[in-house]
């Protein structure tokens, strides 16, 4: 899993650069639109979920990725949850897609706020999402290192901010080295 994260995390930074996003909160829907990935609310996509036999799975998940064919995928999310949690759910599903977890005929339906014991693909999708919506280098450069500040600035829910804080604690003394991450930090700090 760590190799997957190391090889693919840069795609989150690359997307921030390609979309010109350089302020918080990061719009995960804008990222999805850039990737030409439709994002639907469960309330609008209920007929699709039922037709595909995914309705019950979706009702126990904040979000779901539905691969429809080669290069075609739809992300759906629970629109009854608050916006900060929905931002994380959509970012998490984009992580599954960018990390190659979306397989035709198999929907990802285990989306919930980060928690101990997550499977390696879930943990990897959470790490990817973290770098999209709360890039480590930017948080450290801006001094955004408390739960309250992360929640306020990045517009994420409590469990996501706890996950982000735990990753920051693991990276004390961290200095960005990837060219895309360095550029993301530079743009956010203008």
Protein language model features and the residues they cover:
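Active-site hotspot residues in diverse enzymes, especially metal/ion-binding acidic/histidine motifs
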Residues: 1-190
């Amino acid at each position: 899993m760590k190799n997957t994260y190391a090889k693919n995390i840069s795609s989150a930074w690359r997307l921030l650069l390609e979309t010109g996003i350089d302020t918080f909160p990061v719009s995960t829907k804008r990222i999805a639109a850039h990737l030409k990935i439709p994002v639907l609310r469960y309330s609008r996509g209920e007929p699709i979920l039922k037709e595909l036999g995914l309705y019950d799975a979706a009702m126990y998940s904040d979000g779901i990725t539905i691969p429809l064919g080669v290069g075609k995928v739809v992300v759906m999310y629970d629109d009854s949850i608050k916006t900060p949690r929905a931002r994380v759910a959509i970012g998490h599903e984009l992580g599954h897609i960018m990390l190659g977890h979306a397989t035709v005929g198999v929907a990802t339906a285990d989306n919930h706020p980060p928690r101990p014991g997550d499977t390696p693909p879930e943990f990897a999708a959470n790490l990817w999402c973290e770098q999209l919506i709360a890039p480590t280098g930017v948080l450290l450069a801006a001094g955004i290192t408390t739960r309250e500040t992360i929640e306020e600035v990045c517009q994420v829910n409590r469990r996501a901010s706890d996950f982000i804080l735990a990753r920051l604690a693991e990276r004390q003394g961290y200095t960005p080295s990837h060219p895309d991450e360095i550029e993301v930090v530079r743009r956010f700090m203008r």
